[in-house]
Amino acid sequence: MKTAQVNGENIIIKEVEDLKLNGRKGAIVKVLGCGLCGSDIVKFKHKIVKDGAVLGHEIVAVIEEINSDTSFRTGDKIVSSHHIPCFECTYCKHGNFSMCEHFKETNIIPGGFSEKVFLSEEHLKNVAHRVPEQISDEEISFYEPLGCCIRAINRCNLTPNDKTLVIGLGSIGLLMSEALKAMG
């Protein structure tokens, strides 16, 4: 399978061995699309990741192979968060899942900028969701960044007459503007 790997100041396409479950609990999914997150750009630009790293975590995928005690089946189109909160640390208990002390212990393997990734059974049980048929791959690719916007709005405890200001019209700014409009 092909992956887009960091190689110094470049990203190269590299052919690697196809992923297999080999008895592991989880799923091999075919990536239909992957968003380019600002964190991917920062990691690459500032050399935070090592050569060979495959970035990307905002995936839309189809399950190709599965070994899991969940309701997911081969052929299901899904989205999944890349990290799994522990739900037990102080941050998780206060609803700050993205600050989880164990957050970075889990990830999609090798990364969304590849033809396929492995999602653990923990991903499937906790942070993966089926995509309704009427939602396109392009629309659902905003699942993760839109979730960040909605979480921020919910934390602000806004009421319909409150005024807000969105600074910046990158993808997050545009999503935030649309989410604020939709919420009144």
Predicted segments with their positions:
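Conserved beta-strand elements of the Class I
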Residues: 4, 28-29, 165
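Glycine-rich beta-strand-centered segment in the early N-terminal region that forms part
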Residues: 19-34, 47-90, 123, 130-134
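Cytochrome P450 core scaffold surrounding the K-helix E-X-X-R motif
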Residues: 39-43
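NAD(P)H dinucleotide-binding glycine-rich loop of Rossmann-like/cofactor-binding domains
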Residues: 88-167
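Hydrophobic/small residue at the entry helix of a nucleotide-binding pocket
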Residues: 148, 172, 180
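Conserved S-adenosyl-L-methionine
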Residues: 182-184
